């Protein structure tokens, strides 16, 4: 079957028919959500997956909460109008911390969010020092501090907010090399500590894409913890117990918000993740 880039108004070649499968949307502002999708797909390979990324408003980390909520609701609504959804995963820490209540109020399918894996990190740490690596927005939000107070109040939490690491992860998926010097500069506050964190929470879904490089830069033995596997297990449970019967026999598809040259360059990456086509999604506003 041919695989094509598609504009929103361009007809596509029909996918080879298959058995209808529950339709699951994985959404992020960029491509970081692919790390979460990969965990879900590993556990649940036989679903109909849609990946949507907002390359118009990326990155969300510096946007206002009102903007993020309105934007995420608009995009999920547009996808739902094309494909009835059994479940949606907001695979973006920034969007999850602010948009889940609005999404759950509007839609009758389950909506799963991503939160920093502070609870498991607090259990894993040996020296009691946990690093939280996230966007500046996630580091500053009260929700993050509530998680720390609830699950890690006996740990020393060292937080680093970085928008640059999001850009490095996006560049890696575009085929560019990741600068270890840049990572060392970002992580310098920890690397200079007499006793640095022995467990690091990857509090942005982009950051697992940089796991290999992070392990080269951080002290030997540092544990990296993210939410991907837990999100996959939660998705499996909800699909079995609470999701509506929304299925499709279509091939997996990815949506961008603007068909830019940069988005087109992602097609080979998306194909490796199992998405047949990349199409522009028409979004109001």
Curated annotation (Swiss-Prot):
Pfam family of the protein (one): Asp_Glu_race
Transmembrane segments: none
Catalytic activities: L-glutamate = D-glutamate
Keywords: Cell shape, Cell wall biogenesis/degradation, Isomerase, Peptidoglycan synthesis
EC supergroup of this enzyme: isomerase
Disulfide links within the chain: none
Family indicated by similarity: Belongs to the aspartate/glutamate racemases family.
Protein name: Glutamate racemase
Species annotation: Escherichia coli O45:K1 (strain S88 / ExPEC)
